[in-house]
Every structure is written in structure tokens, then in C-alpha cells.
């Protein structure tokens, strides 16, 4: 009916998308869909010339081959090396008629918005925010992905809507964690975090500091995220913070924090170094929204109670009888290319 549709999707260095239906979308809209394939190839060339020396200040975990990271005297590493496959265009937002913005953690997929994965989104009716989302989109559409985008460290994109103060920050050039830290540091009573990946060192330290000054901190982390060799969820546990690993077949895919039941951090960015410094992301910081904060707190409580307390101390396996429905859902929940009863953990 005449609506102009443009889009940007993520591709890796093999010119492949995570979703197999992406080529269909590209075929329908032809030149209106663009991607970061060429940029990732250029980045690969640059990275191939760099030499990396291993940090020897901590002990490497057994049976690991990935880059060694030292944090608080402990070594972290992935089981397998991970060659560069491309930075990620990880945004999930729509701008409609320069007025409305739909954004959050949900991929437009059967599992992402079909109720299987845990996600949340925000809908903004605001020409102000639509303008800045459009500026970000135009950068991506013109080929300025990831580290090529304009630096926006000191850019303040904020507006009061009703009683809430809303701020917007884009990664990787907006230095998102610098905007998130003050809210965590100012927390007085509670911090609830439902999240997919939590590997960021500095934010992990800030959560422990909050716990030590009496703030009640709770974290729900995805099973796959917990299996990541750089995950800091056990560090949080070791320092007294309650962390539950979800035992659902679907993913805990949110990237959210609710502070004092009235401040909300929500968006596409996982709390990881890559999320902050490499991937294209957007994050909304919503302050003083007691109604939405209470709504999200209640939702978090429901999720928290749905996970047995057993998983406060142990980690579930994403594709196993630990995780409800994961052995019968037809999905490769742990990304090992083995589905349901073809995975030994489901036998």
C-alpha cells in the first residue's frame, strides 16, 4: 500500500545470517536491505595483523583453548578458540512514520516473539526518540557499522515523558556502561537482573559492591550464558549474590535491570565487552517510572519463583533433562548442532 520499507541485517564473514529466512527477506525487498558483511571482512584483515600475547598472571582453566582472561585472581577461558566471525549488528528496533519506535531484546523469530524465549520490548510514541533512532539507522544503512560509527561518548539523548526520564545510548560508540554504572552505584534497595550473557568485569564488581552495602541483588541468567567460559555468575554467587540459572527450554534472552523497582535498563545489549565495544546495540535507561518498574519487578518475581532453588547453586545444561522441554522442542538449545535425542545429554 505504498509504505517504504528499509532494513539492516547482520551477516558474518561468510556472508551468512544467523536466521535461515533472512535471504527470503532480502529477495523480497532487494536493494532495500543492507548488511555488515563487507565491513566484517575489512575488520578481519585488520585483526589478522595484530599479535596477541597471553596474560600469565592467572592460571588457565583446564581443557580450555580460548583467550585467557584474568579477573580477581582467577582465570577464565572458553573451551574452544573462537576465530573472528564478524562483529554483530545486534539491534532489534523499528522506526515507524518517524513517530513510533519498537525496541528491546526480542529477535523477530518464532522463538523470539512467539513466547518461547523470555524477552521484553518498549514502544515509544515520540518524534524525539524516533529522530535519534533514525540517525542511527542511517549510519548503519550507509555502511557505518560497529567501530566505524561516529563517537557519541558525551552525547546526551534524554527526554522526560510523563513522569519518567528516558535516556538513549547506542553502542559501541556511546560508551553505554558509563551511563549504566551511576544507576547501579546509586541503588538503595534492590537490583533485579534478567540477562542472557553477563561477562563484563566492571559491572560484576559494581554488583558485588551494591550487595556489600546492603542492596538486595538477584540475577537470572540463561543456561547457555552460564556455560560461557567468561561468565561472571559464579563470581557473583561466591560473593553472596543470589543467581539462578534458568531451567526452561527457551532462552532467558532479556538484557534488563530493574533498580529500586522504579529505574529500568532495557535494550539489545548483553552485559559483555563485545556488547559494549564492538556490536551495534541500543539501550534505554528509564528513571522514575514506578508503574513500569513495579510491572517488571512482578514479572521478574514470577520468573524467579518458576526456577527451583536447586539452580541457585548449580548450573543447568541448556539441552538436557535439566531444562524443561529442551529435549523435545526441535531446537538446538546449546548450539552444538545436536537436537533433542541426538544430543547425548537428552538420552
Describe the predicted segments one by one.
Residues 3-185, 213-263, 267-291, 312:
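HKD-type phospholipase D/PLD-like phosphodiesterase module
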Residues 196-198:
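Long, repeat-rich segments with strong aromatic
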Residues 317-347:
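Extracellular calcium-associated, cysteine-rich motifs in secreted modular proteins
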Residues 188:
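Acidic/histidine-rich, surface-exposed loop or edge segments in extracytoplasmic proteins
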Residues 293-316:
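Amphipathic alpha-helical interface segments
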Residues 176-180, 203, 323:
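Amphipathic coiled-coil/heptad-repeat helices and related helical stalk/stem segments
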Amino acid at each position: 500500500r505504498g509504505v517504504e520499507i528499509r532494513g539492516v541485517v547482520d551477516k558474518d564473514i561468510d556472508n551468512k545470517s544467523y536466521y535461515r529466512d533472512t535471504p527470503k527477506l532480502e529477495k523480497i525487498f532487494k536493494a532495500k536491505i543492507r548488511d555488515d558483511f563487507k565491513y566484517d571482512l575489512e575488520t578481519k584483515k585488520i585483526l589478522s595483523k595484530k599479535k596477541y600475547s597471553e596474560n600469565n598472571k592467572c592460571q588457565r582453566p583446564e581443557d580450555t583453548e580460548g583467550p585467557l582472561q584474568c579477573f580477581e585472581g582467577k582465570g577464565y577461558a572458553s573451551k574452544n578458540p573462537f576465530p573472528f566471525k564478524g562483529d554483530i549488528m545486534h539491534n532489534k528496533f523499528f522506526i515507524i512514520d518517524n513517530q513510533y519506535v519498537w525496541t528491546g531484546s526480542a529477535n523477530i523469530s518464532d522463538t523470539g516473539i512467539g513466547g518461547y524465549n523470555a524477552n521484553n520490548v518498549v514502544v515509544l510514541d515520540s518524534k524525539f526518540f524516533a529522530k535519534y533512532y533514525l540517525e542511527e539507522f542511517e549510519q548503519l544503512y550507509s555502511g557505518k557499522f560497529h567501530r566505524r560509527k561516529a563517537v557519541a561518548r558525551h552525547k546526551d539523548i534524554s527526554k522526560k515523558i510523563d513522569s519518567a526520564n528516558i535516556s538513549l545510548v547506542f553502542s559501541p560508540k556511546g560508551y553505554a556502561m558509563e551511563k549504566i554504572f551511576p544507576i547501579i552505584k546509586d541503588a538503595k534497595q534492590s537490583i533485579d537482573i534478567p540477562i542472557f550473557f553477563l561477562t563484563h568485569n566492571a559491572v560484576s564488581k559494581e554488583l558485588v559492591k551494591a550487595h556489600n552495602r546492603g542492596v538486595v541483588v538477584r540475577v537470572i541468567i540463561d543456561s547457555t550464558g552460564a556455560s560461557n567460559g567468561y561468565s561472571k555468575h559464579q563470581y557473583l554467587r561466591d560473593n553472596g549474590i543470589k543467581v539462578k540459572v534458568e531451567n526452561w527450554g527457551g532462552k532467558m534472552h532479556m538484557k534488563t535491570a530493574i533498580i529500586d523497582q522504579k529505574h529500568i535498563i532495557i535494550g539489545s545489549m548483553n552485559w559483555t565487552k563485545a556488547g559494549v565495544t564492538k556490536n551495534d546495540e541500543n539501550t534505554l535507561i528509564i528513571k522514575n517510572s514506578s508503574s513500569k518498574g513495579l510491572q517488571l519487578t512482578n514479572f521478574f518475581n514470577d520468573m524467579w519463583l518458576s526456577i527451583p532453588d536447586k539452580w541457585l547453586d548449580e548450573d543447568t545444561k541448556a539441552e538436557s533433562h535439566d531444562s524443561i522441554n529442551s529435549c523435545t522442542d526441535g531446537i538446538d538449545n546449546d548450539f552444538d548442532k545436536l537436537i533433542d535425542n541426538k544430543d547425548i545429554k537428552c538420552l
